[in-house]
């Protein structure tokens, strides 16, 4: 087998690459995917989002090493093992990122990736339903919508934010990227609108695009150039030849793993694994970043939450309604209200994110209390803690070693304590008076710094937004893995394009910027002139210097 471009991974970025690289019909594209089909309601029905993440069929099922600052717990670290990658098992929340996120990328050496540069790519990829005119794309492959917003708890959350003195925003992906508002979803016509549905499946209808299901074992490098990919499928090993380039889009865990298996990475570590060093790049696997969050849960005194739908019978009713009409509760991820807030005066951008959910529940679908309730997923999203991805062994089937070093920076503790106290302030507003019952979690007895820290050590979890392990930067940056054209430094014919190249984590969910990365990388690969820079300036809170709201 051979193709002009061989893409490893059909996730958020890989699917976008397959679509754009094959668009003019001049180049052949072959996608290598270790997973399989996304057929069936577990992935396609939005309300079933807890299911695919818990199924080994769709999830690599990684765990971190014991985290010393979190009571040595091993933290769940899912990644999609299916067409569409993690966009097929995620929560379907769509966040571009704040303008300051991308300006920071450029400051860190990713020239040409400032907000003015990436905004046109976000517009190109979007088909926005209800977004801010002039700021959003309307004819791209990726459908983005808002939910039905019928539950009164959603309205109470946004009203409580206003009562607490915070801003509201009509579109946090538009000009005003701060405040309380409606959450956007990658859902269309009642179905999860994954990168597979938006990009990969349309691309596979073209004669010049193919897909092979198998495990990428290593990149073949000859005389300093990537010439193909060794894959395993059906118990046999074979090489897929790349006539032009190999593009790695295998996730922030598996992209650095594959580079290291191929001899690209920290020379000392590769030698310890018995792997021949092809390019000594110490940044491969370094700079691992993520978002953490906890659930703040409250009893609802009125029976308006989704608790009534949790029994198996009623879940079956919702599922049947969705199967028949693609409507009803099954057609939403139920994340329909949110907030992006600044933790302190002097910050240009929000650093706290809220997802509001009108039920008190864990991510695996188990009820947190035998009553109606509501919750927020809340986290400090600009942590300075950094971790790493390394090899466990030279066996391509071995899981990578994930050391996040969560909560290793003192500021993280300060910010998460603030999250607990700020959430109590928001839930204590008049808008929640009609619904507010006892606090389920953390619990009203958790008040002091020491009590909050103890709660956090036991209850903080990943928000599943890993990035940064093949950092993009200037060629003279010894820790950069790819240059701003996404080319691997030191190896010809090889690129990386996915969330692993982010120099710094963005302030929200990563599916949107990952797809944007695939879109922009495709233009670099094809040698196209980048889309014209935008001159639009986003809103900055005029009180930012003196107030957190």
From Swiss-Prot:
Residues 530-549 are annotated as: Disordered. FAD binds at residues 4-33. GO terms for cellular component: membrane. Its cofactor is FAD. One of its GO terms (molecular function) is betaine-aldehyde dehydrogenase (NAD+) activity. Keywords: FAD, Flavoprotein, NAD, Oxidoreductase. Pfam families: GMC_oxred_C (PF05199), GMC_oxred_N (PF00732). It comes from the Bacteria. It catalyses: choline + A = betaine aldehyde + AH2; betaine aldehyde + NAD(+) + H2O = glycine betaine + NADH + 2 H(+). One of its GO terms (biological process) is glycine betaine biosynthetic process from choline. Gene3D superfamilies: FAD/NAD(P)-binding domain, Glucose Oxidase, domain 3. It is an enzyme of class 1 (oxidoreductase). The active site is at residue 465. Involved in the biosynthesis of the osmoprotectant glycine betaine. Catalyzes the oxidation of choline to betaine aldehyde and betaine aldehyde to glycine betaine at the same rate. HAMAP family: Choline_dehydrogen (MF_00750). NCBIfam families: betA (TIGR01810), PRK02106.1 (NF002550). Belongs to the GMC oxidoreductase family. This is Oxygen-dependent choline dehydrogenase. It comes from Rhizobium etli (strain ATCC 51251 / DSM 11541 / JCM 21823 / NBRC 15573 / CFN 42).
């Amino acid at each position: 087998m051979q193709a002009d471009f061989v893409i490893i991974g059909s996730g958020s970025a890989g699917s976008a690459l397959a679509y754009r690289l094959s668009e003019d019909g001049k180049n052949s594209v072959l996608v290598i995917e270790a997973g399989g089909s996304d057929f069936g309601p577990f992935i396609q029905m939005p309300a079933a989002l807890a299911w695919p993440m818990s199924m080994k069929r769709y999830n690599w099922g990684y765990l971190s090493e014991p985290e010393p600052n979190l009571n040595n717990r091993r933290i769940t670290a899912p990644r999609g093992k299916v067409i569409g990658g993690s966009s097929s098992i995620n929560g379907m929340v769509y966040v571009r990122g704040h303008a300051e996120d991308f300006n920071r990328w450029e400051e860190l050496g990713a020239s040409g990736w400032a907000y003015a540069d990436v905004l046109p790519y976000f517009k190109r990829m979007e088909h926005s339903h209800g977004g801010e005119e002039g700021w959003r794309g309307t004819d791209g492959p990726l459908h983005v919508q808002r939910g039905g917003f019928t539950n009164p708890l959603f309205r109470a959350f946004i009203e409580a934010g206003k009562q607490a003195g915070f801003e509201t925003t009509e579109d946090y992906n538009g000009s005003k990227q701060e405040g309380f508002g409606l959450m956007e979803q990658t859902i269309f016509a009642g179905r999860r609108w994954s990168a597979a549905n938006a990009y990969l499946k349309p691309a596979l209808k073209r004669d010049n695009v193919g897909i092979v299901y198998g495990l990428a074992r290593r990149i073949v490098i000859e005389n300093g150039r990537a010439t193909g990919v060794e894959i395993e499928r059906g118990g046999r090993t074979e090489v897929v030849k790349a006539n032009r380039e190999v593009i790695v889009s295998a996730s922030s865990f598996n992209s650095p793993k594959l580079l290291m298996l191929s001899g690209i990475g920290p020379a000392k570590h590769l030698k310890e694994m018995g792997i021949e060093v092809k390019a000594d790049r110490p940044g491969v696997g370094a700079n691992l970043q993520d978002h953490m969050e906890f659930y703040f849960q409250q009893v609802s005194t009125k029976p308006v939450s989704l608790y009534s739908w949790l029994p198996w019978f009623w879940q079956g009713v919702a599922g049947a309604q969705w199967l028949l009409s693609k409507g009803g509760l099954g057609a939403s991820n139920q994340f329909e209200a949110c907030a992006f807030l600044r933790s302190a005066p002097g910050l240009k951008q929000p650093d706290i994110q809220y997802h509001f959910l009108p039920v008190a529940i864990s991510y695996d679908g188990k009820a947190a209390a035998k009553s109606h309730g509501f919750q927020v997923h809340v986290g400090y999203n600009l942590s300075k803690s950094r971790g790493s991805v390394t090899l466990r062994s030279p066996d391509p089937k071995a899981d990578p070693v994930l050391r996040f070093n969560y909560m290793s920076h003192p500021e993280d503790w300060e910010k998460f304590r603030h999250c607990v106290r700020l959430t109590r302030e928001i839930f204590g507003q008049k808008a929640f008076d009609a619904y507010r019952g006892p606090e389920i979690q953390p619990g009203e007895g958790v008040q002091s710094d020491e009590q909050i820290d103890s709660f956090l050590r036991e209850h903080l979890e990943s928000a599943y937004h890993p990035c940064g392990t093949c950092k993009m930067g200037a060629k003279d940056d010894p820790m950069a893995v790819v240059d701003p054209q996404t080319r691997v430094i030191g190896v010809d014919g090889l690129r990386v394009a996915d969330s692993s190249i982010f120099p710094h984590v963005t302030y929200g969910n990563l599916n949107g910027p990952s797809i944007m990365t695939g879109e922009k990388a495709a233009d670099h690969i094809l040698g196209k002139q980048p889309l014209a820079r935008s001159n639009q300036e986003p809103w900055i809170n005029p009180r930012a210097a003196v107030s957190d709201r």
